[in-house]
Amino acid sequence: MTSVLRCSRTLLLAVSGLLAVPSPLAAQQAPAGPAPAATAQPAPSGQPQTPPPWAQGRPDTDGAAKLAPVVPPPIAAAADRLPVTQLKTPKNFNIEVYASGMANARSLRISDKGTVFVSTRLLDKVYAVVDKDGKREVKTLVSGLYRPNGIALHNGTLYIAELNKISKIDNVESQLDSPPKPTLIYDDLPSDEPHGWKFLTVGPDNKLYFNVGAPCNICMPSPAHAQIRRINLDGSGAEVVARGIRQIVGMDWHPVLKQLYFTENQRDWLSEDLPQELSEDLPQDKLNRVTRPGQDNFGFPYCHQGNLPDQQFGWGHNCNEFTQPIALLGPHSAPLGMRFYTGNMFPREYHNAIFIARHGSWNKTVKVGGDIVVAKLNPDGTVKSVEPFMTGFLVNNNYIGRPVDIELMKDGSILISDDWNGAVYRVTYGAPRVSMRR
């Protein structure tokens, strides 16, 4: 009887969630053809088969058993094999290869002198792309790091966030050929692998902001998890900015309101009690903003997508207790990097809009994401619309690229990293042109 009641409640919540929050993005790029089977390796005979963290709560169905995280190629694609000609943008936007040969290219930062720094998550490196005599050269700036996903630049100092520590390299551009070992500034961080990688940015208050993800698909996190923190540039003065956040891989500041916006990846496998098609379509990932620093709670693990109580942890809670998302970005679309557009190259309609990289789903039979969308805002910072901007990374339900981060160049063009191909693309507006420069 208990299981019947739990199933009925979960199904009711799921249906209400689907009816209450339609998403124009959820139906994008509905590719033809089934997803390729991706099965986990069985545990050795005689050993308990403990599921990996990503499989926590996975329904015991044949369809769900075929879904697993998508592993990127182990090496970067050659420049002439990159999918530039298959990517689509609105009229008069142009795409070119800015740099290639950087396996697992993730976060992007551009210095005042034009050096582009590129992090990795699965490798141990941070790259630097240097323009010399009209040719771009890719250097391995530093190696031997652990999950160095987060990077930030401020006054000539490069900050690097690894799994459980943050370090810095002062005067980094004067030492590109022989950089020193990074100097540790902060290590009061958990060492959990699930959602342990960081995104790093410097706020208008000259403080470093970063995420500490929940160490699970769904669980009751410790007081040290599921939050945004900030520290002074020397690592002192740590404080919590917001709580109730499952996982962030992108943040940026509204150029006028100076409020922090961030993408959030919601839980997987909503319930083993649900039909697989409902479990795959709920919940939707989110775009959030912090309006009450130190007080905002975005609901994890009690509430998902702003209106859907968790079937395990949601009892006794109302989703209205928590800070609501300002946009929903599709189920399991994995929104990562995001950037407010403050340049002068693109048409006026994009001014102060947010470009968001949706890395793409893995736990959906028909995948969504693998694209760039643009959120256009009202003057009060709320979202007016979310529209496709760059598509083509997802072909016949298979990835030929996966966008991660977005950065704005001085001339108003934008850079987009692709960790599937180990490349960075540049998007310009104006007379059509194609370049395959490395």
Residue locations for each model-derived region?
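Beta-propeller domain segments
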Residues: 43-90, 197, 214-218, 231-236, ...
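Surface loop/turn motifs at the tips and blade-to-blade linkers of beta-strand repeat domains
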Residues: 97-102, 139-144, 185-192, 240-244, ...
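Beta-rich catalytic cores
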Residues: 104, 122, 137, 144-147, ...
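Short loop/turn segments immediately following the C-termini of beta-strands
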Residues: 113, 120-121, 163-165, 171, ...
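Conserved beta-propeller blade signature
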Residues: 115-119, 157-160, 207-211, 259-263, ...
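A short loop-to-beta-strand structural motif that recurs across blades of beta-propeller domains
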Residues: 125-128, 165-167, 227-229, 286-288, ...
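Asp-box/WD-like beta-propeller blade repeats and closely related beta-sheet repeat scaffolds
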Residues: 138, 147, 152-154, 164-203, ...
